[in-house]
Curated annotation (Swiss-Prot):
<keyword id="KW-0410">Iron transport</keyword>
<feature type="transmembrane region" description="Helical">
    <location>
        <begin position="54"/>
        <end position="74"/>
    </location>
</feature>
<feature type="transmembrane region" description="Helical">
    <location>
        <begin position="8"/>
        <end position="28"/>
    </location>
</feature>
<protein>
    <recommendedName>
        <fullName>Zinc transporter ZIP1</fullName>
    </recommendedName>
</protein>
<keyword id="KW-0408">Iron</keyword>
<feature type="transmembrane region" description="Helical">
    <location>
        <begin position="274"/>
        <end position="294"/>
    </location>
</feature>
<dbReference type="GO" id="GO:0005886">
    <property type="term" value="C:plasma membrane"/>
</dbReference>
<dbReference type="InterPro" id="IPR003689">
    <property type="entry name" value="ZIP"/>
</dbReference>
<keyword id="KW-0862">Zinc</keyword>
<keyword id="KW-1133">Transmembrane helix</keyword>
<dbReference type="Pfam" id="PF02535">
    <property type="entry name" value="Zip"/>
</dbReference>
<keyword id="KW-1003">Cell membrane</keyword>
<keyword id="KW-0472">Membrane</keyword>
<feature type="transmembrane region" description="Helical">
    <location>
        <begin position="187"/>
        <end position="207"/>
    </location>
</feature>
<feature type="topological domain" description="Cytoplasmic">
    <location>
        <begin position="235"/>
        <end position="246"/>
    </location>
</feature>
<dbReference type="GO" id="GO:0071577">
    <property type="term" value="P:zinc ion transmembrane transport"/>
</dbReference>
<dbReference type="GO" id="GO:0006826">
    <property type="term" value="P:iron ion transport"/>
</dbReference>
Length: 358
């Protein structure tokens, strides 16, 4: 199959899965109470194990494919220079520096940018809990055991807005207040940060040079993509935000991964140096996401048996990913154009010198 055609197929799949994830709350009627407690428990177990399974695939695609391949390309290509050096050891060190940049960037998006809590992983976990809670017959609007971060933010915003407008009723200040209200909404930062994260994930697919790895990487990312769509949908629907702005934010999130695939494919033509640096930043981002999802699942106040099941889901997905990557590599090993060209030129020069001597 043609590489470009494979990426186009993945773009279509991402659009469908992401859109479906955003509509899951509406399709399942999650804003209403349900009375089937057994169904609630089953959904809870499926969501938890699916999160652990997805984090295992994320971890595996980093450790067994992206990181080794990036290091291999950088170390074997003497013509690639990073920060004006062609030394292999220094270039590998710089690659890990860009991994560190990606890790810190995702850390900032989750723990520095938000108002109250981190965005991607814990919000996904909160959304998962919200999905579970709304399916339970014992849910009440003001349950004391559940902390509704979004509504708490709105109450704080309303209080700040009322306090700031005491004695002042000018049109300009009201407009500024509405603008600040939007910026301080947790859901606004949540959607933007998840869109950035999705775009970076898409770049990994876009920079791939092998059809098999395009589909493997897509499968790895799609395993947790739907829950991100649920997160965005639940968050936006819990705020009194303008419908136009909601639509813009939803479309931004839905088209983020396809945009990343397109940008990654364009960057691939810029050379292997750019591809390796993009992959390094993506590795740092995915490493943070994969570990954070797993830790948030396992550290919950649950029994040892449930923890064991989640750990086994993680390990099982890692083994599946390792088997897929090993099989793909053995069936269609990578060939790097620059190395082959260098060997061909060297061989041609050697034959030319040999003929000249005779």
């Amino acid at each position: 199959m043609d590489l470009l055609f494979a990426k186009i197929i993945c773009i279509g799949i991402f659009l469908v899965v992401t859109t479906f994830g955003c509509f899951i709350p509406h399709l399942m009627g999650l804003y209403k109470e349900k009375e089937n407690e057994e169904k609630n428990k089953r959904v809870k177990n499926i969501l938890s194990n699916l999160n652990c399974f997805g984090s295992g695939f994320i971890f595996s695609i980093i450790m067994f494919h992206l990181l080794p391949e990036t290091i291999h390309i950088i170390s074997d290509h003497g013509n690639i220079r990073i920060f004006n050096t062609s030394d292999s050891q220094m270039k590998i060190l710089y690659i890990f520096f860009f991994v560190f940049i990606g890790f810190c960037m995702q850390l900032g998006l989750e723990y520095v940018l938000p108002v109250d809590t981190n965005i991607c992983c814990v919000s996904n976990l909160d959304s998962k809990k919200k999905l579970e809670d709304t399916l339970s017959q014992h849910i009440t609007k003001n349950a004391s055991t559940t902390v509704n971060i979004e509504m708490q933010n709105i109450d704080n915003i309303d209080h700040i807005h009322e306090h700031s407008c005491e004695g002042v009723h000018t049109h300009d200040e009201k407009s500024i207040g509405k603008f600040l209200e939007i910026l301080t909404l947790q859901s606004f930062f949540l959607t933007i940060s998840l869109a950035i994260h999705s775009c970076i994930e898409g770049m990994i697919i876009g920079t791939s040079t092998d059809v098999n790895y395009v589909f493997i990487s897509s499968f790895c990312i799609l395993l947790h993509k739907w829950i991100a769509g649920v997160t965005v949908s639940l968050s936006l629907n819990s705020n009194n935000m303008n419908k136009t702005l909601k639509a813009i934010l939803l479309l931004t999130f839905v088209f983020a991964s396809p945009l990343g695939i397109v940008l990654g494919h364009m960057a691939k033509s810029a050379g292997q140096k750019v591809t390796c640096l993009i992959n390094a930043v993506s590795i740092g981002t995915l490493l943070f996401i994969g570990c954070e999802i797993l830790l948030n699942e396992i550290k919950q106040n649950i029994s040892r048996k449930v923890r064991l099941c989640k750990w086994l889901s993680f390990c099982f997905s890692c083994l599946i990913a390792f088997a897929l990557i090993s099989f793909t590599t053995s069936m269609a090993p990578h060939t790097h154009g620059d190395i082959d060209t260098h060997v061909h030129v060297h061989h041609h020069d050697h034959d030319h010198d040999h003929g000249h001597n005779h």
